[in-house]
Amino acid sequence: MSIFAIADAHLSFGTDKPMDSFPGWNDYVGRIEKNWNKLVTDDDTVVIAGDISWAMDFDRLVADFEFINNLKGKKIILKGNHDYWWNTAKKMNEFIDQHGFYTIKILSNNSYSVENISICGSRGWLFDINDEHDEKVLNREVGRLKMSLDSAECDEKIVFLHYPPITTDSKCDEILDLLTIRIIKKTKL
């Protein structure tokens, strides 16, 4: 059993917003499918850390989730900044059940145990100290990450965020402080 991660797939089977119009994205869906199914087994778990689909609603999301559901492994998905279709966990789980997307689980204020590891996470946020809206969003995301960590049942935890808390030119102390308090170790990839 292995745990993999990917983000920013920006699938668009149900909407007209193909990413392969950008340099380096040519046939990206085919490359994702080929490499995913070459590396991932049905016993593995793949965390999809946001920006999953360009869909604006569940109706346009169906084809993207069909694609994801048909890939090997179990999938745990969390929200990215472009997941406009994202809704309450209850509504998303109803959507998943209605369409039989049983390999997909929603990571939202919760965690999942994979073997002896708890998978935790939230979207996170890049914080601009001068923007009141950013402060509200950041506080909400820190709260969501706390709920995810609080729900973890295993001693070992892996945290996934759509927005990395450290970039080349900034860091998000609020998220980093929470991870430090909870003794989440940095892993080299």
Question: Language model features by range: what are they?
Answer:
Residues 9-16, 87-180:
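Conserved catalytic scaffold of divalent metal-dependent phosphoesterases
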Residues 2-8:
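Short, hydrophobic/glycine-enriched beta-strand segments
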Residues 6, 49, 79, 120-123:
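Short glycine-rich loop/turn motifs that provide flexible caps or phosphate-binding loops at active sites
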